[in-house]
Amino acid sequence: DVTFSMLGANGATYYQFF
C-alpha cells in the first residue's frame, strides 16, 4: 500500500482489487 500510495488514492484502491 505504501509503495502504491505514491500513485495516489486511486492507485491504492486499484491495487487492493488485485
Curated annotation (Swiss-Prot):
Transmembrane segments: none annotated. Signal peptide: none annotated. Its EC number is 3.2.2.22. Keywords: Glycoprotein, Hydrolase, Plant defense, Protein synthesis inhibitor, Toxin. The keyword Glycoprotein applies. Glycosylated. This is Ribosome-inactivating protein momorgrosvin. It comes from Siraitia grosvenorii. The lineage of its organism: Eukaryota, Viridiplantae, Streptophyta, Embryophyta, Tracheophyta.
